[in-house]
């Protein structure tokens, strides 16, 4: 029986109690799906109109010329096959991209001069090349100029309408000034705002403000229309004897004290006396009885009201009062009415006056006051006003003003709300416009102002701009779409001009288009956009996290300086969408976030998180994804709510979230429940076991530091994990997964060949070859190396891990090592978080990592002649050339040190004029060495290691040297091996099928020696015929003959395809390289160095506990346990209480218990090897994993599988304790007891130096520690002499510039304080910027003398020059010293 791969898996004991109904989505789905939608390649459905790249073309095309006699239309687009694959692009420093071909149609019209009618004269279609479009690799990255980059998703404010206030900060009175802003996806912003006097203003694009009524006039409303839109009308009818009768609304008087008696108009009864408060009970009574419909108000009460409509004299059309005018009465000294607009109306016989329903309590007169202040009265003057604000200094005309206003908000080319913006606006203002209505309408603007005025009247709430319903994500596809649109618009202008200037009848679309601007826009985006980042490739986790990052910075986003506290803070809507823990420390805190584990981005760009549906108090397995806005309507319980067997809530009151508040709610009101406790946090945070026991600040550091862990020489999965290590290793692409099920056919360190057994399609050879990446350099100079996990003959299922990558162990993420730690001080060496380590750690390469540096040298064609890469270097001894081959390039495997030559290179130098004698000697001896200088590539100071790879690139047509040819031969051999393997498997597959087809059939005729009508048997096939002759057998059955024919055709076609692919690859290898201009040849050398753990290296746990190694102590001096085991690390116990990351202690205890259980299994295996009895092994496994797991998976294993599974866990039984649902204190105690340890988790330790027992028990256990990418080797640096700054002549600073130590202002004070005059003088002159002095010092040191003289420092000369720059001539005079 072929042994399956399952037995090799390491079993983890899972401590989670909550059943998860939903698998975690693919971790890099955000990137992949977004870019697939943009390009519409791969499995994405065919392009819909208006989406992706097709939508971009459709928004720019058709392009008409200025006379509209011709049109260029977009028909379709297609991406061709990329020229180079991912690996080739990375090796050649190229961009992984595919050529984009666009089909365009040029239509030329004939225009009738008399009628102006158009008729089609000519139509031409053509495919036009539009530049290269970068493709995404299967891991969600882009290869740009040979380096892997990630496009980070951006969080920005969603388009739509937002209401806000200034929090009382603008005006000294602290009054809230409300504002409203309409933000489009692209186009002009429109703001409406109140000022301190309660006048409403509008601003376009943050320019000068205008009264809002000006904008409404420009939209075509008149005064009456405006008043009608914003106010209800109330009629005042005059009853001669009693006063005015007006409608009565009881709600409006609730809580007020009327200034006059409220009198029922029908009965004359007083409902409420003046000055008495109207109670809510009285109002309810009035509403219930419903018999009071009209009030009688005093005659004077109408004064101060505003007229709702123009009141006109019917006979002559004269206006008595205009809409919005205030009603007035004028009295004489005796109190008699002598004038005013009310008297005028009454005199004209008008007793029914419509007034605006403004009571200054529920409805304020803001719009009416604004209108009164506005000097404009008509559309024309309003448009002119807007034009003056938008185009100051230009003389306005009505036509120009009208055209400008239309293009601002109503032209789809200039203004786009986007579908999101329209949906948000419809929801906020309760409108019902179609999604496709992407520009503003008159109704939208009117509704916005109405909502703003209602806010001022105290109705409704302002929006919270940090709510995730108001922030959306722009992923790769959308960012790219916007960038491409910019490029096409630049191109559009050029096309229009060209269409008008050329003879349009004779040109093809190709002649009109210059694709450079579009290609440049794409290149600029990938090369230099703030969101296109160099991928963080330290380890697989850092890759995944980088792809899931959400940044609020970048073009169109925030800037660090302007972002306040609110934007950075955690918001209730982040729950399950963005991680509240993982964010950088420092100026970017809260602006750069990480997507939560289960979150996804919907088609509108809002982040959604999944919930299980609760129906009638029962939790179902139905899962709904909800955006933050949808979630506000629901009551959501937490995943850890207690449920019984029927999935019903046990408790009557359940802890829930309701519209941003955390409350206890009755269980029947709950309608959703979280799918998992870890949906709250990001991937990095969910890798921290016992996260629930850590302080949030430390958890933040823990999440961030896991991303800096360096891949070690031998990866080791954590004993105490959380169960998602496997998912991260799988989705990051670090480990290799089988694409389809099959049998392992061949295997070596470089590749795995699998014979596929499923998903076979017609014409498919059924061979999968997986090439492993061997010792490749990552972006962070760490080492990418993959190792096979499988053996020949094993069967693998689709999606199984067949090879481990960097920082993965048996398909699980493994960032560090499990080591024995003791929390105890040791002679002060763990003061301030320092770490003491045992020599065993350094000796056994426990924390050793490999780092690969890349060195590059180019031979250019200079003005004086070409540079040359050669072994023949002037004035260099044979010793220095020992590592170079005959071509002058270092050989692979050479150990190199600082100063060693890697590639020999000579550069011609300028000829100095020669004397005739020199010319003669030159002619006789052919001496050439003098006119070249040595510019070889040497190893930098502080670098050392082993050469692991050399690549040579030659320009087209340049002759290749021996080394380049050798590399080429090796590459071709490798390709040939792949082809031969594929052919071999193809042959075996085809001939096996052919054999099954032929056996037992009758052959009518065949090759020589086969008689007619022979029954085909095994002897005939194996002994009489060669395999090639099998095809010549003609079968009796017509159907069989057809199958044979089809099989033969398929075989030949596959062989041809294989050969063509091989030829294509070989041609690419042999073809010259595209090098930058002027470069003839380029050599890259890769040097690998092993970095052992040493003092000064930074280490950390997963709980934010970090420290620097202070000392390496011999193993025999370390504290040891009673059985003689020395501990590996001593950590400071004082680092725990104040930091409140107790999770590390629980992890230490749990790891200790896991190690103990592993040792028990090891003992059982020893017994088995002695006695052959499996029972102790089964018992030990049952005890370690518990009855459930044992019955489910282990009891059914056969002997080999069980021994293999047990052998995998002898160093400790791996456990998984998921975040917020992991092992509790009782579980830790129970595990310690089962492992045979004390419940306290503490052990007696002995001092390694004296052998004495320590005074009290010490916490000892297994802890997972990481070595971080802050290595002392990269930081330590020394300089004797080196480069100087040009102006000040002082040494440069920093390791990268090979700089010196800064002796700054404060250090000078220190020497001054000690009176160390001579030392100070040296520091400020000869050791710094006294140019003449330092040269003399150097010379005197060489001669062995010890006297020197300090001169004038160069910085003093700089000061003199600056003073002269101010116009003051300052000179240094050499005064003769008088005795």
Curated annotation (Swiss-Prot):
PANTHER family: DNA-DIRECTED RNA POLYMERASE I SUBUNIT 2 (PTHR20856). This is DNA-directed RNA polymerase subunit beta. It catalyses: RNA(n) + a ribonucleoside 5'-triphosphate = RNA(n+1) + diphosphate. DNA-dependent RNA polymerase catalyzes the transcription of DNA into RNA using the four ribonucleoside triphosphates as substrates. InterPro entries: DNA-dir_RNA_pol_bsu_ext_1_sf, DNA-dir_RNA_pol_bsu_external_1, DNA-dir_RNA_pol_su2, DNA-dir_RNAP_su2_dom, DNA-dir_RNAP_su2_hyb_sf, RNA_pol_bsu_bac, RNA_pol_bsu_CS, RNA_pol_bsu_protrusion. Pfam families: RNA_pol_Rpb2_1 (PF04563), RNA_pol_Rpb2_2 (PF04561), RNA_pol_Rpb2_3 (PF04565), RNA_pol_Rpb2_45 (PF10385), RNA_pol_Rpb2_6 (PF00562), RNA_pol_Rpb2_7 (PF04560). GO terms for cellular component: DNA-directed RNA polymerase complex. It comes from Ruegeria sp. (strain TM1040). GO terms for molecular function: DNA binding; DNA-directed RNA polymerase activity; ribonucleoside binding. The RNAP catalytic core consists of 2 alpha, 1 beta, 1 beta' and 1 omega subunit. When a sigma factor is associated with the core the holoenzyme is formed, which can initiate transcription. GO terms for biological process: DNA-templated transcription. Belongs to the RNA polymerase beta chain family. Its EC number is 2.7.7.6. Keywords: DNA-directed RNA polymerase, Nucleotidyltransferase, Transcription, Transferase.
């Amino acid at each position: 029986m072929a042994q399956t791969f399952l037995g090799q898996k390491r079993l983890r004991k899972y401590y989670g109690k909550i059943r998860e109904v939903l698998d975690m989505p693919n971790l890099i789905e955000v990137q992949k799906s977004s870019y697939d939608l943009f390009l519409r390649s791969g499995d994405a459905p065919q392009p819909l109109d208006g989406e992706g790249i097709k939508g971009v073309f459709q928004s720019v095309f058709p392009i008409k010329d200025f006379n509209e006699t011709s049109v260029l239309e977009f028909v379709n687009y297609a991406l061709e096959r990329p020229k180079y694959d991912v690996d080739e692009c990375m090796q050649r420093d190229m961009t992984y991209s595919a050529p984009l071909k666009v089909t365009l149609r040029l239509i030329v019209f004939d225009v009738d001069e008399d009628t102006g009618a158009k008729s089609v004269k000519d139509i031409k279609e053509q495919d036009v090349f539009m530049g290269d479009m970068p493709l995404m690799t299967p891991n969600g990255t882009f290869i740009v100029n040979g380096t892997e980059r990630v496009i980070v998703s951006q969080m920005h404010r969603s388009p739509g309408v937002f209401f806000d206030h200034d929090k009382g900060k603008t005006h000294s009175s602290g009054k809230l000034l409300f504002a409203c802003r309409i933000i489009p996806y692209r186009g002009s912003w429109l703001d409406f705002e109140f000022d301190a006097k309660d006048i409403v203003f509008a601003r376009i694009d943050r320019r000068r403000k205008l009264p809002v009524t000006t904008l409404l006039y420009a939209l075509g409303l008149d005064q009456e229309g405006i008043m009608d839109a914003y106010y209800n009308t109330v009629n005042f009818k005059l009853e001669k004897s009693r006063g005015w009768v007006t409608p009565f609304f009881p709600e409006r008087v609730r809580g007020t004290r009327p200034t006059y008696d409220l009198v029922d108009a029908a009965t004359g009864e007083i409902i409420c006396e003046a000055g008495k408060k109207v109670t809510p009970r009285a109002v309810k009574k009035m509403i219930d009885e419903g018999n009071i419909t009209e009030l009688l108000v005093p005659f004077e009460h109408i004064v101060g009201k505003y007229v709702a409509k123009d009141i006109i004299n019917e006979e002559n059309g004269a206006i008595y009062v205009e809409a919005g005018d205030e009603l007035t009465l004028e009295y004489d000294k005796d109190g008699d009415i002598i004038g005013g607009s009310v008297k005028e109306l009454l005199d004209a016989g008008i007793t029914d006056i419509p007034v605006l329903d403004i009571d200054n309590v529920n409805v304020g007169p803001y719009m009416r006051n604004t209108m009164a202040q506005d000097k404009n009265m008509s559309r024309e003057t309003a448009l002119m006003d807007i034009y003056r604000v938008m185009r100051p200094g230009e003389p306005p005309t009505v036509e120009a003003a009208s055209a400008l206003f239309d293009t601002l908000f109503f032209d789809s080319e200039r203004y786009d709300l986007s579908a999101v913006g329209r949906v948000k606006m419809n929801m906020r203002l309760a409108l019902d416009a179609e999604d496709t209505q992407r520009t503003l309408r008159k109704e939208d603007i009117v509704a916005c102002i109405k909502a703003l005025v209602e806010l001022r009247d105290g109705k409704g709430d302002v929006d919270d701009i940090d709510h995730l319903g108001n922030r959306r994500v722009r992923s790769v596809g959308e960012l790219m779409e916007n960038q491409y649109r910019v490029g096409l618009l630049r191109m559009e202008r050029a096309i229009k001009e060209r269409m008008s200037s050329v003879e349009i009848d004779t040109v093809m679309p190709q002649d009109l288009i210059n694709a450079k601007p579009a290609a440049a826009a794409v290149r600029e985006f990938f090369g230099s956009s703030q969101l296109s980042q160099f991928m963080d490739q330290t380890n697989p986790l850092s890759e995944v996290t980088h792809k899931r990052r959400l940044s609020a910075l970048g073009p169109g986003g925030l800037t660090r300086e302007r972002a306040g506290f609110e934007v950075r803070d955690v918001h209730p809507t982040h729950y399950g969408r963005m991680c509240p823990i993982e964010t950088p420390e420092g100026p970017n805190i809260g602006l750069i976030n990480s997507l939560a584990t289960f979150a996804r981005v919907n088609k509108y760009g809002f982040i959604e998180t999944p919930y299980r549906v609760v129906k009638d108090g029962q939790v179902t397995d139905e899962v709904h994804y909800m955006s933050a806005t949808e979630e506000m309507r629901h009551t959501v319980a937490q995943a850890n709510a207690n449920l019984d067997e029927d999935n019903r809530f046990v408790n009557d009151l359940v802890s829930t979230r309701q519209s941003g508040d955390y409350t206890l709610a009755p269980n029947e009101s709950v309608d959703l429940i979280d799918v998992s406790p870890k949906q709250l946090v990001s991937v990095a945070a969910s890798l921290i076991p016992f996260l629930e026991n850590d302080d949030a600040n430390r958890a933040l550091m823990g999440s961030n530091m896991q991303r800096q862990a360096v891949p070690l020489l031998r990866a080791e999965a954590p004993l105490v994990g959380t169960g998602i290590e496997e998912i991260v290793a799988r989705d990051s692409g670090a480990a290799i997964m089988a694409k389809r099920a099959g049998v392992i056919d061949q295997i070596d360190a470089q590749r795995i060949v699998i014979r596929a057994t499923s998903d076979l399609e017609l014409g498919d050879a059924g061979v999968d070859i997986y090439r492993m990446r061997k010792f490749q350099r990552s972006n962070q100079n760490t080492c990418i190396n993959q190792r096979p996990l499988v053996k020949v003959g094993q069967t693998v299922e689709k999606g199984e891990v067949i090879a481990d990558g960097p920082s993965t162990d048996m398909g699980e993420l493994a960032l560090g090592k499990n080591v024995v730690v003791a929390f105890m001080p040791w002679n002060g060496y763990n003061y301030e978080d320092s770490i003491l380590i045992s020599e065993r750690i350094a000796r056994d390469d426990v924390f050793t990592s490999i780092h690969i540096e890349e060195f590059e040298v180019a031979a250019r064609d200079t003005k004086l002649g070409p540079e040359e890469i050669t072994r023949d270097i002037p004035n260099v001894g044979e010793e220095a050339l020992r590592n170079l081959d005959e071509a002058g390039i270092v050989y692979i495997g050479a150990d190199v040190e600082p100063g060693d030559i890697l590639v020999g290179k000579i550069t011609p130098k300028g000829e100095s004029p020669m004397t005739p004698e020199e010319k003669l000697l030159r002619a006789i001896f052919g001496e050439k060495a003098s006119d070249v200088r040595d510019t070889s590539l040497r190893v930098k100071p502080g670098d050392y290691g082993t050469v692991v790879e050399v690549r040579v690139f030659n320009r087209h047509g340049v002759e290749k040297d021996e080394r380049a040819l050798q590399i080429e031969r090796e590459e071709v051999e490798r390709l040939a091996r792949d082809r031969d393997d594929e052919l071999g498997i193809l042959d075996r597959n085809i001939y096996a099928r052919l054999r099954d087809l032929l056996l037992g059939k009758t052959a009518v005729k065949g090759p020589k020696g086969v008689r007619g009508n022979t029954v085909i048997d095994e002897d005939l096939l194996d002994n009489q015929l060669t395999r090639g002759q099998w095809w010549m057998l003609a079968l009796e059955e017509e159907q069989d003959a057809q199958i044979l024919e089809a099989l033969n055709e398929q075989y030949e076609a596959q062989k041809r395809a294989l050969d063509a692919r091989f030829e294509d690859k070989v041609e690419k290898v042999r073809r010259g390289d595209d090098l930058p201009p002027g470069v003839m040849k380029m050599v890259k050398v890769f040097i690998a160095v092993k970095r052992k753990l040493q003092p000064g290296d930074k280490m950390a746990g997963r709980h934010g506990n970090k420290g620097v190694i202070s000392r390496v102590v011999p193993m025999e001096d370390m504290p040891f346990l009673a059985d003689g085991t020395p501990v590996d690390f001593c950590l400071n116990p004082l680092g725990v209480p104040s930091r409140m990351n107790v999770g590390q202690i629980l992890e230490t205890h749990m790891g200790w218990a896991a190690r103990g259980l592993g040792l028990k299994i090891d003992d059982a295996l020893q017994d088995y090897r002695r006695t052959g009895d499996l029972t102790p092994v089964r018992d030990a496994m049952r005890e370690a994993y518990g009855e459930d797991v044992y019955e489910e998976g282990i009891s059914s294993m056969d002997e080999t599988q069980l021994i293999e599974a047990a052998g995998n866990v002898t160093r400790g039984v791996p456990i998984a304790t998921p975040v917020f649902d992991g092992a509790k204190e009782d579980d830790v105690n129970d595990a310690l007891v089962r492992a045979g340890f004390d419940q306290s988790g503490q052990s007696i330790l002995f001092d390694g130096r004296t052998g004495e027992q320590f005074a009290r028990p010490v916490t000892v256990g297994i802890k997972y520690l990481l070595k971080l990418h802050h290595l002392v080797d990269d930081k330590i640096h020394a300089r004797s002499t080196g480069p100087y700054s040009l102006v000040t002549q002082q040494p440069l600073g920093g390791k990268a510039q090979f700089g010196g130590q800064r002796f700054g202002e404060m250090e000078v004070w220190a020497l001054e304080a000690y009176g160390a005059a001579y030392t100070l003088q040296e520091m400020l002159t000869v050791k710094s910027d006294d140019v003449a002095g330092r040269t003399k010092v150097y010379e005197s040191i060489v001669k062995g003398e010890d006297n020197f003289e300090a001169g004038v420092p160069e910085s003093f000369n700089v000061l003199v020059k600056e003073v002269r720059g101010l116009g003051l001539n300052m000179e240094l005079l050499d005064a003769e010293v008088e005795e």
